[in-house]
């Protein structure tokens, strides 16, 4: 069995991480240069914070977010319409045995970060943090 078979449930390999970063960088470059002619994409600045590769390197999941977070569904639909073009451009710029199929998903890490910030700002957590801080100061004295 190959090493990739063992890593399906575990952490990504160095090769997966390296290829994902190359694809992320190339995709960001393509979207920032407005190479794709689509009115929806031209009206947005799109960030690509993360790309994840399958163990066989044949599938890339690109997490995208338009600046401001508005119209995410229309942006993903537009990217899906131009998936073949983007795949061919990536294949020309990155020399791999196979050009990976690309899936686009909304990046929800910003929403998750906002939820964590809201939890940390809640009165119950503030009270607990203040109590812990007071106890730490008393122990230090």
UniProtKB/Swiss-Prot annotation:
Compartment list: Cytoplasm
Q: Name one GO cellular component term.
A: cytosol
Cytoplasm among keywords? yes
Quaternary structure note: Monomer. Binds 30S ribosomal subunits, but not 50S ribosomal subunits or 70S ribosomes.
What is the recorded function of this protein according to its Swiss-Prot or TrEMBL entry?
One of several proteins that assist in the late maturation steps of the functional core of the 30S ribosomal subunit. Associates with free 30S ribosomal subunits (but not with 30S subunits that are part of 70S ribosomes or polysomes). Required for efficient processing of 16S rRNA. May interact with the 5'-terminal helix region of 16S rRNA.
Q: Which family does it belong to?
A: Belongs to the RbfA family.
- HAMAP family, per the entry: RbfA
Question: Which PANTHER family does the UniProt entry name for this protein?
Answer: RIBOSOME-BINDING FACTOR A, CHLOROPLASTIC-RELATED (PTHR33515:SF1)
| Protein name, as recorded | Ribosome-binding factor A
Q: Which organism is it from?
A: Beijerinckia indica subsp. indica (strain ATCC 9039 / DSM 1715 / NCIMB 8712)
Q: Which gene encodes it?
A: rbfA
């Amino acid at each position: 069995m190959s090493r990739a078979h063992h890593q399906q449930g575990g952490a990504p390999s160095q090769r997966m991480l390296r290829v994902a970063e190359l694809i992320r960088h190339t995709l960001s470059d393509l979207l920032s240069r407005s190479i794709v002619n689509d009115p929806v994409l031209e009206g947005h600045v799109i960030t690509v914070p993360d790309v994840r590769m399958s163990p066989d390197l044949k599938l890339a999941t690109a997490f995208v977010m338009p600046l401001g977070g508005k119209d995410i569904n229309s942006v993903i639909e537009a990217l899906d319409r131009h998936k073949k073009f983007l795949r061919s451009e990536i294949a020309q710029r990155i020399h791999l045995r196979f050009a990976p199929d690309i899936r686009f998903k909304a990046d929800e890490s910003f929403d998750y970060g906002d939820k964590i910030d809201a939890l940390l700002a809640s009165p119950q957590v503030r009270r607990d943090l203040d109590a812990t801080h007071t106890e730490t100061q008393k122990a230090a004295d």
